[in-house]
Every structure is written in C-alpha cells, then in structure tokens.
Curated annotation (Swiss-Prot):
Belongs to the bacterial ribosomal protein bS20 family. This is Small ribosomal subunit protein bS20. GO terms for molecular function: small ribosomal subunit rRNA binding; structural constituent of ribosome. Disulfide bonds: none annotated. Binds directly to 16S ribosomal RNA. HAMAP family: Ribosomal_bS20. GO terms for biological process: translation. InterPro entries: Ribosomal_bS20, Ribosomal_bS20_sf. Keywords: Ribonucleoprotein, Ribosomal protein, RNA-binding, rRNA-binding. Residues 1-27 are annotated as: Disordered. It comes from the Bacteria. GO terms for cellular component: cytosol; small ribosomal subunit.
Amino acid sequence: MANIKSAKKRAIQSEKRRQHNASRRSMTRTYLKKVIAAIASGDKAAAVAAFATAQPIMDRMATKGLIHKNKAARHKSRLSAQIKAMA
C-alpha cells in the first residue's frame, strides 16, 4: 500500500474507476448479447429493437474510451449486416 498521501488518493481513485469501468463494460456486453440472442431467435422486430438500444451505448462507450472506436464500429457493422440478412 502507498505511503504518500497523493499515492493513496490515486490508488483509491484507480480502484473506483476500475469498478465503474467494469460495470460499464459488463452493461455493454449484456446489450450485445441481447441483440445476438434476438438474431439467433429469428425475430427480426426484436433484433431491430435490441440493436437500436445497443447502438448508442456502443457509441457512448467508444467516446468515453472504454472500448476502441473501431471495435464499436465493427460490432455495429456486423450486427447490422446480420439483421439485414434475416429478411
């Protein structure tokens, strides 16, 4: 454990941020799983609705630096293509 006051503060802040980021990352994965499950079930309306919910969350996480912007774009592109292919 750190001995210097500023180092102690940084350690506390780091842990707080780690937990916050883990929560956000988990939430993002959950929304992605909902879209994937809707696609797997074959229900296009549910898939479109789930994708519409997940898309801004992916963008927000990319903007905040939680995931890379290219990863967010890749997920959105692949899910969108899968939904379009459902026809």
